[in-house]
């Protein structure tokens, strides 16, 4: 079985994230969504809520699992025997950041590959931070959430 991990904070998990998972499932047999967090900075209940929300999206998709992790992505990948990290890229800045992360993952993960999915044009403006900002101002964000 070819497993990939998809890591992020997913605060919140958006339709852009869901699109990446869908596209990854076309290539991999299993996708583990890893919610990265720093226990010193993030309440565990916040992470548990995100896990529950994402699991609800994939309740009928047995090829997707969701869990939290608080160490290196390469270590998280190794625990799941993952062959790749999948990431979404919306901007040139995203690409530069993910390219550097890919190098670290390859070095630390014994050849762990990174597969980049470029955001579909209609989803390129969707980001968790933008959704949080809209929520802060009381706007309806349902169209940005799966």
Region spans (language model):
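Nucleotidyltransferase catalytic core that binds NTPs
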Residues: 1-146
């Amino acid at each position: 079985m070819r497993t990939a991990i998809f890591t992020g904070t997913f605060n919140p998990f958006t339709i852009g994230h869901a699109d990446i998972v869908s596209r990854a499932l076309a290539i991999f047999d299993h996708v583990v969504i890893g919610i990265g967090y720093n226990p010193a900075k993030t309440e565990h209940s916040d992470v548990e809520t995100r896990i529950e929300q994402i699991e609800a999206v994939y309740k009928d998709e047995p090829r997707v699992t969701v869990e939290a992790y608080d160490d290196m992505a390469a270590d998280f990948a190794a625990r799941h025997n993952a062959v790749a990290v999948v990431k979404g890229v919306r901007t040139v800045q995203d690409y530069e950041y993910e390219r550097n992360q890919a190098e670290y993952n390859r070095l630390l993960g014994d050849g762990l590959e990174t597969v980049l999915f470029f955001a579909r044009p209609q989803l390129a403006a969707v980001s968790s931070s933008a959704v949080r900002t809209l929520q802060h101002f009381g706007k309806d964000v349902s169209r940005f959430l799966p």
